[in-house]
C-alpha cells in the first residue's frame, strides 16, 4: 500500500530519507520536510509492506519555466527511495504511480523526473 503522507508521518519520511540524502542529522531532514509540508507545495508518498515503511517519494511544485513543458506549475520528483532489501519488487514503480496520480489530483499536467 502507498499512502499520501501527512504531518504525522514526517519522522517516518526522515528515517527513510536519511538513507538516501547526505545530511548531518536526521533533525535537519525533519525540519526541511516540516517546512515543505507547511508550504503545501510538497507531497510525500510512503510505501508500506504490512505496517513497515519501506520507501517514499517527494514531489514539489515548480512555478519557474521548465524546458519541455507547456504548463505551470510542474510537478518535480525530488527523490524516490526504497530500502535495499525491498528492491526489485516493483515498489518504486508503485510509489511513482502514486506520486503521478497525486500530481494529477492537483491539476498538474507534467511531472519532471531527472534520474541518474
Annotate each PLM feature.
Residues 25-48, 58:
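Active-site rim helix/loop that mediates acceptor-substrate recognition in acyltransferases
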Residues 1-13:
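A short beta-loop-alpha structural element at the N-terminal edge
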Residues 46, 52-61, 76, 81:
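Conserved beta-strand in the GNAT
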Residues 86-98:
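Conserved acetyl-CoA pyrophosphate-binding loop and the N-cap/start of the following alpha-helix
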Residues 64-77, 87, 109:
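A conserved beta-turn-beta hairpin within the catalytic core of GNAT-like acetyltransferases
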